[in-house]
A protein has these predicted regions:
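Short, Lys/Arg-rich flexible segments
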Residues: 1-134
């Protein structure tokens, strides 16, 4: 009795398909994390004029995503990320880090950190759905 075992290397095809899906994956991850950050900011009342919440944006090597509001300027948004396979998200508003990390007179609000943690389960689901081709 002969047993014939054949192993095929399909890694090149898998990597090519992953590379093809990368723009959609990164954009979906950016959408989810920004949505969760903005939702947390609303829940925790981290809104005064709306400029900071409106500036939450992301950038991938394929797209810069933002939704400008009347309170925002063009420089408020994250843009021009050229690093392969990454999503850069947050805000370029000059006081964003003070609200996130706090100051000697203001407690840290951790809106980026909390929103990111809240987004992780949904990001996993979205990525799985995209990779399965559903």
């Amino acid at each position: 009795m002969n047993i014939d075992i054949r192993i095929e290397d399909n890694s090149a095809e898998v990597l090519k398909e992953l590379d093809n899906k990368m723009p959609e994956l990164l954009s979906s991850m950016g959408n989810e994390v920004c949505k969760h950050i903005q939702n947390f900011m609303t829940e925790d009342k981290i809104v005064d004029t709306g400029r900071l919440r409106g500036s939450i944006s992301y950038s991938t090597p394929y797209i810069d995503y933002n939704i400008p509001t009347l309170a925002n300027t063009a420089n408020d948004f994250i843009k021009n990320n050229k690093e392969k396979n990454t999503v850069v998200y947050g805000s370029n508003v000059e006081y964003a880090s003070y609200v996130e990390l706090g100051t000697s007179k203001q407690r840290a609000r951790n809106y980026v950190k909390t929103g990111t943690y809240r987004a992780i389960p949904q990001i996993k689901k979205v990525v799985e759905t995209i990779l399965k081709g559903e």
